[in-house]
């Protein structure tokens, strides 16, 4: 599973390095070096203010997601909402394989939507990973502090 937070950089051409631990997870846990990068769901930071990163989906996880979106039933989304999800998540997605040095190219349309400039983070989220600009990550973490389910029985049951 993807765990941890890794600070790195992205150059002006969109080249960055997938953390070695994440490359290992792709192959050892998910059995494939291929992955997809796409937009994440927007995170609401306030009235009319949203932040967004990118998501790295292992190949098999992405195919399973596509299948669910293709069928569309049982998701609890209207046809307009489902179309919006497909436009935001599926349309911009790119299939990737890191080179022998772990480098990957993030295309301009994804860099722009996630406001990726120089300092970026790869964040493990168990079955997927996220890519954030340092500034956007800090905003989302502040929001997470407000949204954290303090005294949640569910968290207590999990041992957290």
Curated annotation (Swiss-Prot):
Pfam families: MraZ
InterPro entries: MraZ (IPR003444), MraZ_C (IPR035644), MraZ_dom (IPR020603), MraZ_N (IPR035642), MraZ_sf (IPR038619), SpoVT-AbrB_dom (IPR007159), SpoVT-AbrB_sf (IPR037914)
Compartmental location: Cytoplasm, Nucleoid
Gene3D superfamilies: Transcriptional regulator MraZ domain
Biological processes, Gene Ontology terms: negative regulation of DNA-templated transcription initiation
Annotated SUPFAM superfamilies: AbrB/MazE/MraZ-like
Quaternary structure note: Forms oligomers.
Name the UniProt record assigns to this protein: Transcriptional regulator MraZ
UniProt organism field: Geotalea uraniireducens (strain Rf4) (Geobacter uraniireducens)
The encoding gene: mraZ
């Amino acid at each position: 599973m993807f765990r941890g937070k890794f600070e790195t950089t992205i150059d002006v051409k969109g080249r960055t390095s997938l953390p070695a631990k994440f490359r290992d997870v792709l192959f050892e846990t998910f059995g494939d070096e291929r992955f997809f990068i796409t937009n994440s769901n927007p995170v609401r930071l306030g009235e009319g203010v949203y932040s967004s990163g990118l998501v790295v989906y292992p190949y098999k996880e992405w195919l399973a997601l596509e299948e669910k979106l293709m069928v569309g039933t049982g998701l609890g989304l209207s046809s307009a909402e489902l179309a919006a999800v497909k436009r935001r998540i599926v349309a911009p997605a790119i299939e990737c394989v890191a080179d022998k040095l772990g480098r990957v190219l993030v295309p301009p349309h994804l860099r722009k939507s996630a406001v990726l400039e120089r300092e970026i983070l790869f964040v493990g989220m168990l079955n997927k990973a996220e890519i954030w600009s340092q500034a956007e990550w800090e905003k989302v973490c502040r929001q997470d502090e407000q949204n954290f389910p303090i005294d949640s029985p569910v968290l207590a049951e999990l041992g957290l």
